[in-house]
Design a protein with these regions (language model features):
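Extracytoplasmic metal-acquisition and chelation regions
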Residues: 2-7, 11-18, 25, 29-249
Length: 249
C-alpha cells in the first residue's frame, strides 16, 4: 500500500484527465488486497461517482445529503474531522461550494484534495456575465463533461492506491458505459419534443449544460447561484414566453 504520495503527484491527476478510457473491460473487478481507500466527498454527485469507481476498494462518505444547497453549505466540526481522516478528499470546485472555497484551497496544501469538476477543460465550460472570472459549475448536467470529473476521480484513487488500478479502471469503464447509454436514450426521447417547445424554465439556473447537450433553451428564474433573487417582472415575462411558445408543464 503506497499512500505516502506527494501533493504534487496528486495534482498531476488533472493534467492527465483527457486521456482516453481503456476499451477492453475484464469480466469482473479485481479483488482488493489492501485496505479500502477512505474517501470523503462534498456532494452526492461526487460521492456517487466515487462509490461507483471505488466499489469494494473504497469507503465513501458524502457530507451533503439530499436537498442540501451546496452553494450555501458550510463545513461543520464533524465534517472537518471526517475530512482530516480521509485518504482522499473530493469536492466539486468551480465555486459550487462557494462558502467552502477558501477552506478547501487551504486544506489542499498538505492533503490529498481534488476539485473534480475543475478537470473539465475551460473551453468546455460556460462563463456567466453575472460572475466575472467564474464558470457555471453544474457540469454533471451534461454526461460528456461529467466524464472528465469521473476520470479525474479514478486517477486520483489510482495515485493513492496503485494496487487497485485494474479494479478502479474496470469499475470506471462500466460506470461511464451506463452513463453513455442513459444519455443516448435521453437524446432519443427529448428529440421528439417539437423544436419550438424545447424551452426549459427552472427556479435555479442550473441546467445550461443540459440545454447544450440535448438542444433545449434554458431560462432560470434565479441565476446560477441560489443566492440571487427573482423579480416579479421576470416571472411575468417568463409566463408570457411559455404561453407564446406553447410549452407544456
Amino acid at each position: 500500500m503506497n499512500r505516502s504520495l506527494s501533493r504534487r503527484r496528486l495534482l498531476q491527476t488533472l493534467a492527465g484527465t483527457t486521456a482516453g478510457l481503456a476499451i477492453a473491460m475484464p469480466a469482473t473487478p479485481a479483488v482488493a488486497t489492501s485496505h479500502p481507500i477512505n474517501v470523503t466527498a462534498t456532494t452526492g454527485m461526487i460521492g456517487d461517482a466515487a462509490r461507483r469507481i471505488g466499489g469494494k476498494n473504497a469507503r465513501v462518505k458524502s457530507l451533503m445529503g439530499p436537498g442540501v444547497d451546496p452553494h450555501a453549505y458550510r463545513q461543520t466540526r464533524t465534517d472537518i474531522l471526517a475530512l482530516s481522516r480521509a485518504d482522499l478528499v473530493l469536492w466539486h470546485g468551480l465555486y459550487l461550494e462557494a462558502q467552502m472555497e477558501g477552506f478547501f484551497r487551504g486544506f489542499a496544501e498538505d492533503r490529498f484534495v481534488l476539485a473534480a469538476a475543475e478537470a473539465v477543460p475551460t473551453d468546455l465550460l460556460i462563463a456567466h456575465d453575472d460572475y466575472s472570472g467564474k464558470f457555471d459549475p453544474h457540469i454533471w448536467m451534461d454526461p460528456e463533461r461529467w466524464v472528465y470529473a469521473v476520470r479525474a476521480i479514478r486517477d486520483a484513487m489510482i495515485n493513492i492506491e496503485p494496487e487497485f488500478s485494474t479494479a478502479l479502471r474496470t469499475n470506471t469503464d462500466r460506470y461511464l458505459a451506463e452513463i453513455a447509454q442513459v444519455s443516448s436514450y435521453a437524446k432519443h426521447v427529448l428529440a421528439t419534443v417539437p423544436a419550438e417547445q424545447r424551452l426549459l424554465v427552472t427556479a435555479h439556473d442550473a441546467f445550461n449544460y443540459f440545454g447544450l447537450a440535448y438542444g433545449f433553451e434554458v431560462v432560470g428564474i434565479q441565476g446560477i447561484s441560489t443566492e440571487s433573487e427573482a423579480g416579479l417582472n421576470r416571472i411575468s415575462a417568463l409566463v408570457d414566453l411559455l404561453v407564446q411558445r406553447k410549452v407544456r408543464a
